[in-house]
């Protein structure tokens, strides 16, 4: 939780507020793969057990290698967790029964890996008793009254602190330059840093320089960042699988852009249409594939950059679409 405790506190304060009887208690954390969203919402939920004495329910809406949970399946799963018997009901009846139960109890529902607003809406109740905390893979802009927070890479100081917490002060300070290299090779992503720290802590005979050397190979980096069932590659793969074809295909044309880019670069590589290029840039940002890196030299046009883990995965782990190297139409 290096650098994230203020956000944890804000989430807890919002979800436990009772001063407004019409206040919808919904909080959404959005960010790219590896940004630590799951750990963040679990930490926030852990401190709210007393506020929701009727229970906390955790649901992974899109587990690895599985189809996303439909709204109806989610409703029935939460109903079962609350002791309901939804089997005989149709979707509308089951949804109404769930909302009634949530309005009469103090329950916190925690949803991980949300892909769409439709997965969340069935749980929203105009009542302050229950609350919903969501980790989302993309913007859920259509959800009403949400308390939204974006997370991404850690600041450099927080990233170094996270690695130091996992590996130990003595080791990181004895190899400061190697520690800095590891932090940057991990793109300061909490998941990548966590895996790197576990790799080192379970190998006390290996140096940070050894790890930095392994991570320096960009083609193998994302595959190497795996310990047990924790994998940066798997995290990014889940995002990539959810991308529609009209987003995934152009993404392959942008992966060799290591720096920032804007409308002109997209028009040169993907489409001659300025409107299409602008819409694509919006969609990539909306889906947490890119982040805003600044504005142009004239202070005007927005500049973007691919999230490093997304770029590495797209470049080295999945084949490009047919005709990738053909000129853009």
Question: Could you describe each region identified by the protein language model?
Answer:
Residues 1-112, 128-136, 147-153, 159, ...:
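Walker A/P-loop phosphate-binding element recognition
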Residues 123, 152-194, 279:
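Amphipathic alpha-helical segments of the small helical/lid subdomains adjacent to P-loop NTPase cores
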Residues 212-219, 223-227, 308-312, 317-318, ...:
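Amphipathic helix-loop-helix modules that constitute alpha-helical solenoid scaffolds
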Residues 114-123, 144-146:
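Conserved ATPase-coupling elements of RecA-like P-loop NTPase cores
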Residues 113-114, 135-139, 197-198, 308:
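A short beta-strand-to-loop transition that corresponds to the Sensor-1 phosphate-sensing loop
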Residues 42, 134, 175-179, 241-324:
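C-terminal boundary/linker of central alpha/beta nucleotide-binding cores
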Residues 180-184, 191-202, 237, 252-253, ...:
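C-terminal helical "lid" of AAA+/P-loop NTPase domains
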Residues 199-247:
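Loop-to-helix "switch" segment enriched in basic
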